[in-house]
Amino acid sequence: MSDRHYDLGMGDHDRLQKELGGGIPRGAIVLIEGDYGAGKSVISQRFSYGLTQEDALVTLISTELDTRGFLDQMHSLEYEMVKPLLNEEFLFIAAEIDSGGSILSGGDDNDRKDLLRRLMEAETLWEADVVIVDTFDAILRNDPKFEALVRQNEERQAALEIIGFFRDV
């Protein structure tokens, strides 16, 4: 790791680190946009693997995969993540969201509906050097408080509060 960037590793495997100017700047908030099926999750998985190979502590929150699905996907990409998981160098959190907007496990009904607050208050996941959320919009779409702000045309204020939180972390 350099003083200014988190190295993405695998320089002999692909050009990602070079194409991104030497890695991910420390303290950066990075947003990856694209259509459904464009490969955003695979890029997140590539970041996770490369960063852990370069000794960064990484948390990946996925609204799309459970732990088994994640490990199978990583294995198919030849990114072995079992050792980093067992060594606590990598934290994978499956945020399984059902069609009703609830996280499927844990908490009472009120907690399960307040997804964004629960994410922000989960201190352990923010202890990593790099935190990746795949897919953040699923959490926002299913959070009633964020949804209420959008209905009141206050989405800009909600976005500023979220960005402010991430900057403080």
Where are these regions (language model features)?
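Generic hydrophobic alpha-helical segments
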Residues: 12, 16, 20, 112-123, ...
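Substrate-engagement module of ASCE P-loop NTPases
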Residues: 151-169
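Residue-level preference for nonpolar/small residues embedded in alpha-helices
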Residues: 43, 66, 115, 162-165
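The Walker A/P-loop phosphate-binding site
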Residues: 1-77
